[in-house]
Structures are given as C-alpha cells and as structure tokens.
Amino acid sequence: FPFDLLPRMIDAGDWVEIVAGLVQRVRALELFLSDIYGPRDAVADGVIPNTLVMTCGGYLRPVVGIEPPGGRRIYLAGVDLVRDDSGQWRVLEDNLRNPSGLSYVLQNRAFMRRLMPEAFASHLVANVDHAALLLRDALTAMVPDEDAGCIALLSPGPWNAAYAEHAYLAQQMGAELVEGRDLVTRHRRVWMQTTGGMRPVSV
C-alpha cells in the first residue's frame, strides 16, 4: 500500500473545519440518496434529470422504495480532498459505493509511530486507532437488540486488489470476512455457511 514518509500535517483548527464540512457533505449525500431511492422529489422538481438517474451505472433499481434500518445508507464515505492554490480545501471526489483506504490509514499510522516516536511525542497527533471500532459501532447500531447475528464484511476474494484491506478491517472490527459463495438467503434472512453450520448475519 502507498506510504508517505512525510505525511501532510493538518493543524487542529483546519481539521475541525474539515470535519464539519465533511459531516455536512455526507448528510447532504444521505438525504440525496434517501430521496432518489424514495420520493424522488429532486427528479420531480427538475433538480436532476430522470435520465441521468436511470442511466447511472451505480443506481440500484431493486432497492427503490426500501427503507434501510435506521434510515441510513452511508456508513463509510471515502472523500478525496485537495488543497487549491489559495490554500482552500476542495473535494476531488466522493466514493460511497466501496470506499477503501481506512486500513491504510491505520497501518500507516502504526508504522509511523514505530518509525518516528519522537515526532508523535513532540506533536499532539490525533489518534486514529479506534476508527475500525467506530465503523463496527455504526454498523451494529442498526441491528435490533434481539438479533443474534454477526457482522460480515463481504469481499470479492483474495484476487481482489483490496483484499488485504478487507481482511485487516474484518480482523480489527471482529467481523467475519466472507465471499458471496459463503452466504445464502433463507426465510428473508442472510446466513453464513460455516463448518459448524449456518450462522445468521445481521449486517
């Protein structure tokens, strides 16, 4: 994975502003997805052409009208930022379908801490070690209390370029790493096939 020996340092004031902007942006994207898969007011009001929605390769027609648990569709967003000539932060792109890179952040930070402990001692570097646990907590928050299923991280398999990340995140979250062939649906529920029998999957 990519490793930058001299990572970009962002001061706390800038970071607070970036976080506020990213939270606002992801909330707006969440509202947009809820509308596009629900009442479609943005299309009806002419904000976005219906043709653009219907011909988009990422538009999943089978989930139109389905309200996800807790009403949330976005649990992890990959937002690429750049700083322009004037020093302002700009969004280069959003990735909501299959964002990657979280494990790289965690592994890079752990490596940097071992490589340059004095830099971490002399600066108040924000801790990111809990990021995978925050993701796990966000996923489990949508599961009803009575549900005894597990969390499964679905991966295309070892041949996929992001497989190492999938394995690392699953391990960090305490989730099961599965491929499509490991899963079946029965009685309107997803089950994971294991050597010990079928195990329900909650998320």
Predicted features and spans:
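Preference for protein termini
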Residues: 1-203
